[in-house]
C-alpha cells in the first residue's frame, strides 16, 4: 500500500476506529510500506494487472451514490499504458452506460482486481476518462 493511498483512505474517522479496534499499529506499518512520493505502478503491480481477465470498477453518480460494475474479458483486458496509466476497452456490456455516464461528470474511480485462485487482490484509485477509439485512435494505441 502506498502512503498516498493510505492518506486518501484513512480519514480521521477511519483512523479513530482503527485505534478503538486495535488495528492502528498494523495499518500504520502498511501505510508506510512504499515510498510516499512514488505512486508509480511497479513491475509486480503491472504483472498482476495484465494477468487479469476481470475486475470491478466503482464510479460515483451525479447524486453522489457509488456504483460498482464488473468488467470481464480475455486475460490482459487491462493494459498498462505507462507507470501511471492503465486502459481497457469498454465493450458493449449491458447497454445501461451507468459507469461511462458517471465518469462524464465525476472522474474519480476505484478498481478492484482479484486473483481468486491465489487469494490476492489489488486496489487502485484514480481518475478515469472515456476515449472514443473511433475519433481518438492515437490515445488508445
Regions found by a protein language model. Give the residues of each.
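Binding-site signature for planar aromatic cofactors or substrates
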Residues: 1-141
Amino acid at each position: 500500500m502506498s502512503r498516498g493511498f493510505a492518506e486518501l483512505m484513512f480519514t480521521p474517522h477511519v483512523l479513530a476506529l482503527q485505534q478503538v479496534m486495535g488495528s492502528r499499529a498494523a495499518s500504520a506499518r502498511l501505510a508506510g510500506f512504499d515510498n510516499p512520493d512514488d505512486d508509480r505502478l511497479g513491475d509486480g503491480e503491472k504483472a498482476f494487472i495484465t494477468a487479469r481477465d476481470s475486475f470491478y470498477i466503482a464510479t460515483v453518480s451525479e447524486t453522489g451514490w457509488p456504483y460498482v460494475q464488473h468488467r470481464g474479458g480475455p486475460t490482459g483486458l487491462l493494459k498498462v499504458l505507462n507507470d501511471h496509466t492503465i486502459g481497457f476497452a469498454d465493450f458493449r456490456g449491458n447497454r445501461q452506460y451507468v459507469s461511462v455516464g458517471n465518469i462524464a461528470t465525476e472522474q474519480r474511480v476505484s478498481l478492484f482486481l482479484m486473483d481468486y485462485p491465489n487469494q490476492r487482490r489489488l486496489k487502485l484509485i484514480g481518475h478515469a476518462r472515456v476515449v472514443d477509439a473511433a475519433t481518438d485512435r492515437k490515445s488508445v494505441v
